[in-house]
Amino acid sequence: MLKYSVGLDISSKKIDCCFSSIDMGQKVKVQSTVTVSNNPTGFNLLADWIDKNHRQKDIALVICMEATGVYYESCALFLFEKACKVSVILPNKAKKYLQALGLKSKNDSIDAKGLAQMGAEQNLKLWEPMGKYFYELRQFTRQYQNIQEQITVYRNQLHSLKNSMYINKAIVKQLEQVIKLFTKQLKELEEQIKNHLESNPEVMQKTENICKIKGVGILSLATVLAETNGFSLFESSRQLVSFAGYDVVENQSGKRVGKTKISKKGNSRIRRILFMPAFTVVRCKEAPFLNLYTRTFSNHGIKMKSYVAVQKKLLVIIYSLYKNNQPYDPKRQNIQEKEQVLPSLLAS
């Protein structure tokens, strides 16, 4: 026996579980299956069931589950606190793996079996829970974004209604009231986000350092920190760039050379929140960002492509300042940029 693996298909009410093992010949065998409730009572039953089937304690065991909304979080945290090795898989990654197995049918028990096999065959990255501070900050920033999107929806409806053939004044009034309420809630959330940041003096100090960049406000930075868990899981800026979907992917085959572009296979909330700051830092002529924009735009003449490059650089500088607890200094950043460019010029 090489490894034990438990696959969990988690929904709002129940958890379908499959306990499998893989031997020296890479053959995966289902040992046991069970269904428990997605609540503390079910978690305890799950832990007992896993312990019962984990007969050879010296053999590694991993628990594999999908990131299904928020339904997996309580179970994952419970198992993590029990010192279990937990891997949380993105739904699209799990889906492609199950398709590769040639499974034509789909139900909860089949998904649990597939996840168990995935955990047995692959060396998956282990999951760590987000700290309470950044988890609550993420709840604030995501709610802010949700309300912003709702305001946009209702404003579009209001605009359409006011330009229709017959205007229903009652509905116009109702929409205006909803927009007013949401706008009030946005202001309340802004204050709550600021208060939450201030509750941690170390984070607030770093926030003030970074917000010296013209165009980067507390809300933008709070969103980046919330989505990255305060950069705690990143060992390099390259990892962060990939996480945010700013990494460049090639499109080449044989003699054919296609266009390169960013992958966008990452956290879209980070890219969304850095959209406006990228415009602002260029407009305010912040040297490191303006230089990058000018240089890239002169190469290809595409404004948005240059602004994406600015977004990426902005994220990397935020990461560096936060990790090193340094205030933003445009002169210093400009010197660092020249030092990085010079070796490449000498090499060429």
Which stretches of residues belong to each language-model region?
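Gly/Thr-rich phosphate-binding beta-strand-loop-beta motif of the actin/hexokinase/Hsp70
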Residues: L2-I22, L115
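Short, solvent-exposed helix-loop connector elements
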Residues: H54, L126-F140, I171, R256-K264, ...
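Acidic, metal-coordinating catalytic cores used for nucleic-acid/nucleotide bond scission
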Residues: L61-S74
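Intrinsically disordered, low-complexity and often Lys/Arg-enriched segments
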Residues: M1-L2, G25-T33, Q336-S348
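Phosphate-backbone recognition surface of nucleic-acid-processing proteins
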Residues: K212, I218, V224-K303
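Nucleic-acid-processing active sites and adjacent nucleic-acid-binding tracks
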Residues: G25-K57, V62
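Low-complexity, acidic/Ser/Thr- and charged residue-rich accessory regions of DNA metabolism proteins
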Residues: K255-R256, Y293-S348
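Long, charge-rich intrinsically disordered scaffolds of nucleic-acid metabolism proteins
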Residues: L77, S87-N209
